[in-house]
Amino acid sequence: MKKSLSLFAIFILTFLGLVIPFITLTAFRPLNEEQYTLKQESSTGKGINETDFINTMFLRSSFFENWSETNYFINPTLKTSKNLLFNDKWYLDFLQDSYSTGVVYDKPGEIFLNYYRQWHSLKNKYMVEKFYDVKKENFLNDLTDFIYAFAVKYKMFDVSKEIVENVDRYKENHYPRVKLKQDNWKLITDYNWLKDNFDNKYYFVIWKQSYSKEWEIMKFKHNMRYDMKIESYIKNNSFKGLYRWDGDGEPQTPTIDKNTGEITDWNSYQQSRVKQFIDLSLYSVLQENIRVQQGGSADYENPNKVGTKRIIFDFETVDELDVKNIKKAIYRMILTVDEANLIISGSLELNNINNDDLSFNFSFMRTGMGEVFNFNGSIYSSLNSKDLKYYQQFSGQFDLSKFLQSFFASALVPVFQNRSLFIENGYIDNLQYDTVLVNFFALKLQNFNNILLIENINDKLQFDKLLNSMFKISQKFYTNYLRTIFDLENNTYVQGYNKKYGLLVNNGFKIYPRYFYFSDKYKQLDIKLYSAFKNRFYTINNYGSVFNYDFSVANNYNIKLNSGYVFGGDLQNKYGLQYKKIEEQKIGYNVFELQAQKENDMYRYYDFNFGIYNWQEINNGGLFPDKQWWQVQYVTPKGWWDFGAHIKNAVIWIVNTIPGVKQVNELASGVGKVFETVYSFFSQIFEVWKFNPALYSTITNIFLLIIFMKFVRLI
């Protein structure tokens, strides 16, 4: 009998040894092996094959896969068979199309460049020099300042308005930056004051000699000899006027009418010529200002010296809870790329708006030795804090590939934007790609020591402190601001039929919702899900780029179908929380629309299972004190032969029971203590294993060990 049991046990183990790998391998097939229609990409020729590329770009199976420490999604090197270099063309295209907020071509427009090259003749042709000397060494700023000053003086309101709206330095301060020539010449009427107050300024005087009927103009620096001459010319009625130059440098002598002695510069004809030039050049000047403001070079002597393209990433943080003084900070990264699509330089800087707590600049440039880049970083805090009290500066060499991988592997989070007004007014086809949100918490915890090409431990610690200080941010932003997007108690009264609420998931992320949770207080409600595919950049006149969205996979759901209550008993009455199961879509969604079907109805939304909630609030009781939220529901087997269901239930038991395994989604979260993803846990656990071979192997071995121990007891 024992022998028969032993043979039976061996048979069962052998059978399971064959079946379990088959089941698991079937469950964990790569996405590109599923029956999906994907656009096949040819080999990039940059050290990555077609399969790796498809896995990298399309294996986005769940929201909290995006937080996995072993996930390729933000750092493709973790999933591909070969290490990617920072200058791989498709890698840059991937970052550009998924996360960048703009692309600038780092060459000025030909029209503006011709103004620079032909300025010597243009300033005479259009008589600009009669009003102002535009300096070529600071050509763009000086020309812009002249046009603005001229427009203000001669009441060209449309021109000054265009400059204020497009040139950053005029948005806050509308005063002219420069004076026109006529504003620098001051008419002197008190000649006695001139004698008593000697200065070293330039003057010009209009007078005529006793032997001549023609008026003449003379320029001089203040000295006593001219003071005495002026007195004699006044007595002889041969004096027209005296002017003092209050500008910088030596001025040009104005032109006069020799018969009348009147100054002919700045007359109506000359004004009209300048106005013609402004009408001709304003658009090009404004576009050039925009290009330079976005990181383009203003070196017009060597327009080909720098990279041909700059990829811009604007990472934004906003504290909207402080209504009286909204604080906004924009962290901007710029990667300068040459014609061979190689990164040759870049920078990372902080610009504060209504917030001067911290500022920094981190720039780097290629040395010519592969991935080795020289860097220079500086940081300054205007507030007294424990972490940073003074100006710091550090320079050296680092590995750019490792820096970019570390940065993008930690920096990006999905952005959920309230697009209700756009959707309500039928603008869903015109969604704009807005500023990217950066995860400063993860960046602050990132260890940047390994990217520094130096062995001195003190230098490494200083470098790490420098970068971590750059990514310093208040926890208030994460605990409060993000919750305002998905407030658990957000009541909305519908004032008209088909009232809609919509959001867009940004930062290149897709959501894979399985359940939608909602209140039972409303009467009728529908939801819609879209998959909005962002087109690649298309460029307007080489000065900027915009995105368009193509919508597909739109799903309409009656909220009452396939729904039920999350909790029973007292909790059902307490929360009134219902769920609706949603059909699984492998390609994911990034647009969600909530639509009420009854006038004056009230609805309350609890979002999808990808909720962004305060982790501590959920874990400390918060919405669901009984902690049943995290329990995975068991699968009902079709019969004793349903080994798949038995295997799944065994895994569910492990997840719900064994300490540590229960927190598996925390292991899959790079943000850990900041966000918890509320999920249909069972549906996602196999997805987590697929991207974490170590975790998959561990739990599988535990499961096999349990089965083995059962059979040992039988034997």
UniProtKB/Swiss-Prot annotation:
It comes from the Viruses. Keywords: Host membrane, Membrane, Transmembrane, Transmembrane helix. Its main location: host cell. The chain crosses the membrane at residues 688-708. GO terms for cellular component: host cell membrane; membrane. It is found in: Host membrane. Pfam families: DUF3688 (PF12461). It is a single-pass membrane protein. Belongs to the plectrovirus ORF1 family. This is Uncharacterized protein ORF1. The lineage of its organism: Viruses, Monodnaviria, Loebvirae, Hofneiviricota, Faserviricetes.
